[in-house]
Swiss-Prot record:
Residues where ATP binds: S233, G234, G235, V236, D237, S238, S239
Function summary: Catalyzes the synthesis of GMP from XMP.
Active-site residue numbers: C84, H179, E181
Keyword field: ATP-binding, Glutamine amidotransferase, GMP biosynthesis, Ligase, Nucleotide-binding, Purine biosynthesis
Catalytic reaction annotation: XMP + L-glutamine + ATP + H2O = GMP + L-glutamate + AMP + diphosphate + 2 H(+)
Single GO MF descriptor: ATP binding
EC number: 6.3.5.2
InterPro entries according to UniProt: Class_I_gatase-like, GATASE, GMP_synth_C, GMP_synth_GATase, GMP_synthase, GMPS_ATP_PPase_dom, NAD/GMP_synthase, Rossmann-like_a/b/a_fold
Residue ranges constituting the GMPS ATP-PPase domain according to the UniProt record: 206-398
Metabolic or biological pathway, per its Swiss-Prot or TrEMBL entry: Purine metabolism; GMP biosynthesis; GMP from XMP (L-Gln route): step 1/1
Protein name: GMP synthase [glutamine-hydrolyzing]
CDD domains: GATase1_GMP_Synthase, GMP_synthase_C
Residue ranges of domain Glutamine amidotransferase type-1 in the record: 4-205
Amino acid sequence: MHQRILILDYGSQVTQLIARRVREAGVYSEIHPGDVDDAFIREQAAQGLKGVILSGSHASAYEEGSMRVPAAVFELGLPVLGICYGMQAMALQLGGKVSFSDHREFGYAEIVAQGGTKLLSGLADFQNDAGQDVLKVWMSHGDKVTELPPGFSLMASTPSCPIAAMADESRGYYAVQFHPEVTHTVQGKALFSRFVREICGCEGDWNMPDYISEAVARIREQVGNDEVILGLSGGVDSSVAAALIHRAIGDQLTCVFVDHGLLRLNEGLQVMQTFSENMGVKIIHVDATEQFMGKLAGVADPEAKRKIIGREFVEVFQTEAGKLQGAKWLAQGTIYPDVIESAGAKTGKAAAIKSHHNVGGLPETLNLQLLEPLRELFKDEVRELGVALGLPPQMVYRHPFPGPGLGVRILGEVKHEYAELLRRADAIFIEELRNTKDPASDLSWYDLTSQAFAVFLPVKSVGVMGDGRTYEYVVALRAVQTFDFMTADWAPLPHPLLAKVSSRIINEVRGINRVVYDVSSKPPATIEWE
């Protein structure tokens, strides 16, 4: 059993980043709601728990009815790290005082370290004129600790937040008002590594080779000799799930690959070559293009299109699953963020939560047990696992693609003609992004963007080609850069790259005579157009 760190979530939108930072230090971590009972905490302690981290929150710690830290957290003798709200809750429960700050801090701040604590000693971005260590951090708080609890000492301060960090090293309690989990805090990774490795004493036994061995053993034990069916979309999550399950049980796995006619150029062929021909996975390839296109005819509303595509996929999958009489398990590519978001939606703890199609996705009428081998992993870990399992890096590290496919990248009604034009234009855009390197970083512009794609606009514009007038369609190019997809900036692609993409699309894709580039950030725009 792995050593583990328990993260108690009080509603912060970046709690998942805490878990990722801990895992980057080679230590397994799990997120659970902040109001779990004492029995749960003690149960965790009996399963290799080495420390606890208390997350931030959008709520105020001193308001009546605010969430409190389970008492057992402070009774087990384990190291505890409080972050923002977690610091304030710790202070209140251990005898300190918290008040609303006259000067709310949001954004970059510079904190001055006080004394040599285990957590912050030597973690400096620079030294000030007085020779004190200074860290560049990210603040986001309205409340602040105004009086230290008994036994605590000051660890760091800012002019507007005199108690920016505190510690009771005799008990292993540490708390910071800033957010070390976000990339803006320069020493954030080092801080988490020091807490989990040096203070909690974790050895760093969380790694991908061991995970593969353990996951294969779990799948074999769970499934036995039963048959498993999996809906293979060609996306990263379902592809990695298929590769992992196939390694565990071989021909007991059957994948159903539904081609709805809205995939990227040659995507169906690539999926079949990778899994069926190269890996020997049993795949049922269903070309349901006409069925989907027929149902989408005349439908322009984006949400209606999504629902139709989702409904038809379930119908096709159910039909194929019904033909496999021996199947007893339904495998899905559910990953850890899906599980966290689903739990948050049920408890209502998070401020902004989306539902996910994988969690409880397909109807219970299939009467199949659920197999989710990736449910402990974050996306970056899923990609690492995919490479370790032998999947092509281009498949594993490809940009996100919406479940409804090109159906939501064709504005308005979906038609065969529109899908074919968009497929070819999009392929040219992606090809040129892969082939063009940024001299400063030596990375391709595909790697420097988080998501890039073409959008089909169902309007025509006047153009001139040769000596003749044209009246043809328009495509928009969209490329964004983001850390978390909650906010995003449009990517500053080089003008020569955009010029080449535009020229190729207009010359090679008959039916398109104008290319535009989307320079909208999120917010106010969303990444996808529909």
